Amino acid sequence: MAIISSLANHLLIAMPSLKDPNFERSVVYLCEHNEQGSVGLIINRPLQFPLSIVFEQLQIEPIRVEKNGLPLLFGGPVQPERGFVIHKQMGGWRSSLFLQDEVTVTTSNDIIRAIAYDEGPKDVLITLGYAAWTEQQLEREIMSNTWLVCPYKSEILYEVPFEERWEYAGLTLGIKMNQLSSDAGHA
């Protein structure tokens, strides 16, 4: 069995026992995991307002009306005013972090303008806020059965409907999430 030294570029799946409203039934893409802590983005929690709100705030008039309807996602409780665009292709954006072949995270407004003008990446998720864990906090939560760890799957990030991602991520591990007990315990 291989030992994983970093959980970066993995997915966290909230166990049914996790009742924190910020993380209940969430799937988190881990952008960073090291000895200082972890940072991730929740990828299955659409907010009640669309991207058109961001376009209005930035005074952008999108070329294609359907861009207005792109959902914004709740990325986590830390800095909820801060936006993150998860996308496949690189590009010349001002502030991008390449994480792996299919995942780049950009935080600069130029990518939002490109999306509005139909010049941005095809596959995108736009989140507000992020999740963070202090040193060893995530490891303790995993050991206490708060999270399952799933290898990255492109379809979970870009194709599976938001409301199905939690169950789908579990199925990639052979687990039916709705059949797990919300009671924590150890055998």
Swiss-Prot record:
GO terms for cellular component: cytosol. It comes from the Bacteria. InterPro entries: AlgH-like (IPR003774). It holds the Pfam family DUF179. Belongs to the UPF0301 (AlgH) family. This is UPF0301 protein lpg0586. It comes from Legionella pneumophila subsp. pneumophila (strain Philadelphia 1 / ATCC 33152 / DSM 7513).
